[in-house]
Structures are given as structure tokens and as C-alpha cells.
């Protein structure tokens, strides 16, 4: 189904808005994927906050023109699905994870702002922890000394109470 000029302008505007907020874009060739597989991929992407879209490559080129993702336009050939994410690793994780279980989805390239990634770069990006995971690790590291200090402070009255209970038990037994 072909789009008229107004529809194309709307699509370009929508994708340009997503690209303007994006921290990463990953493209993959989806040749041979059935509808059920694409539906599962879309559901996974939606849950991860990844904007996933099949676009004509010329429309995608226009959407990334003049942005930090412009170097990606050289890679736009063939039937591609675009994963656009505000988190630098989410799109790579979703598409690389799906590509592991479904060999018909082939990751072609990816891009961080002003940085083009090849297939291996996207797979390496997918293995990195997300921002939320890094923040939770940092928070755990920051809380550990405080929690240990609180447990140590709590141990003094606990030992005292155990000592009193032992004296009470001795006197009760005598």
C-alpha cells in the first residue's frame, strides 16, 4: 500500500519526533519473519519502551537527516525494522534477544548519537546493563555500608538483652 505525500509527511514527522528523543537506533532485516513472530517482537518492544516500526528506507533517511543519527542512513537497504529507544541499550537488547531465538531476524547496524555501530557493536551494546540496572547496583552499593552499620549498632542492645535473659534463666534455675 503506497502512501500519498501527506501520509508520508505524517510518518516522517512521527519518526523524526521519536528520533529527536532517542539515545539509540537499531536496524534489523526481517525477511522471512511470519506475522506471529513480528507480533511477539512488537509486544516485547512495547514492554521495554522501544519504538518499533517498519518503514520505507527513503522515509527513514528523511527522518534521520540532520540528526545525530544521520550516519545510519548509509546502512538503510533491504526490508528493515527500526528499533528506536530513549535508553541506549533497550533497542539493542530487544532486537538482539529476539534475533537469538529467531534466526530470520538479522541485525544489520545500530547507532548511538554520532556513533555508527556494526552488528558486533549492537550485540556488545545488548550485553551492557541498562540505566535502571546500573542505578540499582549503585544504590545497593551505597546502602550496604549504612545497613551494616545499623546492624552493628543493633547488635549491642541485642547482646545485652541476651545476657540479661541468661542471668534471669540462671537465677530461675537456682
UniProtKB/Swiss-Prot annotation:
In its UniProt record, a GO molecular function of this protein is: structural constituent of ribosome
Question: Which key words are in the record?
Answer: Ribonucleoprotein, Ribosomal protein, RNA-binding, rRNA-binding
Q: Which CDD domains does this chain map to?
A: Ribosomal_L10
Task: Offer one example of a GO biological process linked to this entry.
Answer: translation
Q: How does it assemble?
A: Part of the ribosomal stalk of the 50S ribosomal subunit. The N-terminus interacts with L11 and the large rRNA to form the base of the stalk. The C-terminus forms an elongated spine to which L12 dimers bind in a sequential fashion forming a multimeric L10(L12)X complex.
**Function statement:** Forms part of the ribosomal stalk, playing a central role in the interaction of the ribosome with GTP-bound translation factors.
* The name this protein goes by in its record: Large ribosomal subunit protein uL10
* Organism (species): Bordetella petrii (strain ATCC BAA-461 / DSM 12804 / CCUG 43448)
- The gene from which this protein is expressed is rplJ
